[in-house]
Amino acid sequence: MATNRRVERVASLIKREVSQMLMSGIKDDRVGAGMVSVTDVVVSGDLQHTKIFVSIYGTPEAKAETMEGLKSAASYVRSELGQRVRLRRTPEVIFVEDKGLERGTQVISLLEQLTREREAREAAQAAAGVVDSTEDA
């Protein structure tokens, strides 16, 4: 079992190499359907498996197409990693869509909507001459 420091270093190397492959190495047209970036890489403690989290910008159809392209390119990515990263055994590659950025954007949008609604409600109350009792406390 590798140390945490080694696992983190291997994850960092894999992230860098896969990012470079996404920019220039993968020739599958489906991968180019949406803008793809590697957001995180998780490597198992025994360095046998790696999950590569990718963020995809585009329509839902483009995202699905891009994920299919990435899944079909997993064996190519693994063989390239074997040549670029010096490991005794190259880990199995699994691509996972990272929806964290998308969810974060949705949360921010909802918060902005709530703020606008509250401001409109307060403006309507002020125009009617009603004072909010929570502000007096």
Curated annotation (Swiss-Prot):
Highest taxon of source: Bacteria
InterPro entries, alphabetized: KH_dom-like_a/b (IPR015946), RbfA (IPR000238), RbfA_dom_sf (IPR023799), Ribosome-bd_factorA_CS (IPR020053)
Keywords (A to Z) from UniProt: Cytoplasm, Ribosome biogenesis
Pfam families attached to this UniProt entry: RBFA
Chief place where the protein resides: cytoplasm
Gene Ontology MF annotations: ribosomal small subunit binding
GO biological process: maturation of SSU-rRNA
A Gene Ontology term for the protein's cellular component: cytosol
Keyword Cytoplasm (UniProt): yes
Protein's cellular compartments: Cytoplasm
Function: One of several proteins that assist in the late maturation steps of the functional core of the 30S ribosomal subunit. Associates with free 30S ribosomal subunits (but not with 30S subunits that are part of 70S ribosomes or polysomes). Required for efficient processing of 16S rRNA. May interact with the 5'-terminal helix region of 16S rRNA.
Quaternary structure and partners: Monomer. Binds 30S ribosomal subunits, but not 50S ribosomal subunits or 70S ribosomes.
NCBIfam families associated with the record: rbfA
Family named by the database record: Belongs to the RbfA family.
Protein name per the record: Ribosome-binding factor A
Organism: Synechococcus elongatus (strain ATCC 33912 / PCC 7942 / FACHB-805)
